[in-house]
Amino acid sequence: MGSYPDGFPGSMDELDFNKDFDLPPSSNQTLGLANGFYLDDLDFSSLDPPEAYPSQNNNNNNINNKAVAGDLLSSSSDDADFSDSVLKYISQVLMEEDMEEKPCMFHDALALQAAEKSLYEALGEKYPSSSSASSVDHPERLASDSPDGSCSGGAFSDYASTTTTTSSDSHWSVDGLENRPSWLHTPMPSNFVFQSTSRSNSVTGGGGGGNSAVYGSGFGDDLVSNMFKDDELAMQFKKGVEEASKFLPKSSQLFIDVDSYIPMNSGSKENGSEVFVKTEKKDETEHHHHHSYAPPPNRLTGKKSHWRDEDEDFVEERSNKQSAVYVEESELSEMFDKILVCGPGKPVCILNQNFPTESAKVVTAQSNGAKIRGKKSTSTSHSNDSKKETADLRTLLVLCAQAVSVDDRRTANEMLRQIREHSSPLGNGSERLAHYFANSLEARLAGTGTQIYTALSSKKTSAADMLKAYQTYMSVCPFKKAAIIFANHSMMRFTANANTIHIIDFGISYGFQWPALIHRLSLSRPGGSPKLRITGIELPQRGFRPAEGVQETGHRLARYCQRHNVPFEYNAIAQKWETIQVEDLKLRQGEYVVVNSLFRFRNLLDETVLVNSPRDAVLKLIRKINPNVFIPAILSGNYNAPFFVTRFREALFHYSAVFDMCDSKLAREDEMRLMYEKEFYGREIVNVVACEGTERVERPETYKQWQARLIRAGFRQLPLEKELMQNLKLKIENGYDKNFDVDQNGNWLLQGWKGRIVYASSLWVPSSS
């Protein structure tokens, strides 16, 4: 605990942007609001290495005698770096006190565009097209004068002596608390749920044909039927239908419950009329103990709920209020001990201890042997039926897509009815796949794909829940781990003699990639670590603090660098990537410049939408930067065709491999798996299938298409290191399922599942180099 004398650092709550710093007398650093406050001049000789990182206490002679190249290719070192650094870093982020209330940083591309349109409509102005957006004058940044003290010139942490210089573009939305696009200003019922059109009854009135609205309760005229008029209500009471009162809205405004995006399984007719209240995910007993009224957690199981009591009106009124987060002091202290006091082994995952990992597979099998054996035997006995069902579901999905493409609603609805009978968000991989694709086809058929996708993006899922789901995915899937090891090892090899390393990260998000690199830099040189500069680039968040998320990432990395005695400087940029100028990056002479991106270029629009595409604009920007090395990791997919049926088939093949991978590694009832599939894969599928034009932001290309694009942009490819490729293959073969593939094609590192390529990484330099 000695490394945190002032307690465990929070995030924005502990930042005082107007506070003067008491600097240690031994340091020669200078403080300037314009140029920033850096760690390179600090004297760290008086700092004791933290106990949480025993590698810092190794004998200096051992470190001095290590060859850098030999240490870099150590198989156990790479695994330890990732497990002890990245997963611990994720757990540390989860432990921040206000993480439950923060918005997620993983996805917001289309929500930003929709919020901009809404702002222009509110101002009575016309929203500019994407091609002319850069030439339009925008309102001044509010971050510099924010009443909470945030500023675009510099963001200071009074715990770690560092500064993050922030550049926040004016292309962000000022939506206050609940900004919605114009088409979301029309209220939707709280029981908004995907429903098969041929099986559903009217959600609100209990009568009417299911073909009247695709979702049971939709937009426009269908919404009017959800709100009883006085004469209709009187007629219902005369008939003695007391159940009608249950469907009346209890407040003056209906709200969107996007969690109802998951349709019910067999009891959809009964559940369709229920109104669920958004609450924190806690045990049912804890809800009653703290007087937090909520229905039983049966939304994912599809079981009929009998939760109705006298306080229902009060609960439904409370559902429109912001939920309060309550954590007992003893529980918080215990979690602090687990994250801060850890031994030389791998740290314990404190927030999701039961998630399955490769190393814990044997222990899990021993403790739950009977249950797991039963599942496997059941799966084996029905293997032939599963294969037949998979083929049938894929055929039905393709036929349904063809019917939707020609607006054959009768055939499409019949196909959807058959798909619904054999699909479920809790089933096997093919059933889950069919469930999300059926949802997307329904959305496209109703013309509400953009609304649903943006509602899912605007949904108030806490960053903590999203990080837990992401952590579960990282623990069982080697794709991103291998890409991070490939990029970090290449950086270490290229920067062996550099005094200053400047990493420009497009899509830094929470910065999961960099703790392992920082740890390696601290041990790489006997004379001390080189200075590390990171420019974190992200899209602006909604609200009055568009750069808050990317700034907090810088503060976490600064604290990590301070513990490892690595001089550090951070520059935060929150704006549309195609509008960034070279001057915003603050390049300096003599530094080794590395441009990095981890699977985020797929969200940039291409030339099929705009002549001057953002995808080419970003590549031109990188070429102007003239980096020493450019390391892109891309999602290799072919579902970017403008023709719907072709795109649908390719997306179906791609996500079939992804869902099959999750099904083989994670339990079907795993809550984190459910959340990850819904929040990541489910949203992506909705965007690919149900959105068009600029609203379709999921636009992956194959690695061969990216190779041609990068060559046109003025780059040439570097060969891969044979020893690194061999080590990565050994790691995957020995530590993960045999169906994970790692291969090399030309100068590309390819990763896939059962022969289908999913991700690719490579090294590039400017052609003139």
UniProtKB/Swiss-Prot annotation:
<dbReference type="GO" id="GO:0003700">
    <property type="term" value="F:DNA-binding transcription factor activity"/>
</dbReference>
<feature type="region of interest" description="Disordered">
    <location>
        <begin position="279"/>
        <end position="320"/>
    </location>
</feature>
<feature type="region of interest" description="VHIID">
    <location>
        <begin position="470"/>
        <end position="536"/>
    </location>
</feature>
<feature type="region of interest" description="Disordered">
    <location>
        <begin position="364"/>
        <end position="388"/>
    </location>
</feature>
<keyword id="KW-0539">Nucleus</keyword>
<protein>
    <recommendedName>
        <fullName>Scarecrow-like protein 14</fullName>
    </recommendedName>
</protein>
<dbReference type="GO" id="GO:0006355">
    <property type="term" value="P:regulation of DNA-templated transcription"/>
</dbReference>
<feature type="region of interest" description="Leucine repeat II (LRII)">
    <location>
        <begin position="552"/>
        <end position="584"/>
    </location>
</feature>
<dbReference type="GO" id="GO:0005634">
    <property type="term" value="C:nucleus"/>
</dbReference>
<feature type="region of interest" description="PFYRE">
    <location>
        <begin position="593"/>
        <end position="687"/>
    </location>
</feature>
<feature type="region of interest" description="Disordered">
    <location>
        <begin position="1"/>
        <end position="23"/>
    </location>
</feature>
<dbReference type="Pfam" id="PF03514">
    <property type="entry name" value="GRAS"/>
</dbReference>
<dbReference type="InterPro" id="IPR005202">
    <property type="entry name" value="TF_GRAS"/>
</dbReference>
<feature type="domain" description="GRAS">
    <location>
        <begin position="384"/>
        <end position="765"/>
    </location>
</feature>
<dbReference type="GO" id="GO:0045893">
    <property type="term" value="P:positive regulation of DNA-templated transcription"/>
</dbReference>
<comment type="similarity">
    <text>Belongs to the GRAS family.</text>
</comment>
<dbReference type="GO" id="GO:0080183">
    <property type="term" value="P:response to photooxidative stress"/>
</dbReference>
<dbReference type="GO" id="GO:0000976">
    <property type="term" value="F:transcription cis-regulatory region binding"/>
</dbReference>
<keyword id="KW-0805">Transcription regulation</keyword>
<feature type="region of interest" description="SAW">
    <location>
        <begin position="690"/>
        <end position="765"/>
    </location>
</feature>
<dbReference type="GO" id="GO:0005829">
    <property type="term" value="C:cytosol"/>
</dbReference>
<comment type="function">
    <text>Probable transcription factor involved in plant development.</text>
</comment>
<dbReference type="GO" id="GO:0009410">
    <property type="term" value="P:response to xenobiotic stimulus"/>
</dbReference>
<keyword id="KW-0804">Transcription</keyword>
<feature type="short sequence motif" description="VHIID">
    <location>
        <begin position="501"/>
        <end position="505"/>
    </location>
</feature>
<feature type="region of interest" description="Leucine repeat I (LRI)">
    <location>
        <begin position="391"/>
        <end position="451"/>
    </location>
</feature>
<feature type="region of interest" description="Disordered">
    <location>
        <begin position="128"/>
        <end position="157"/>
    </location>
</feature>
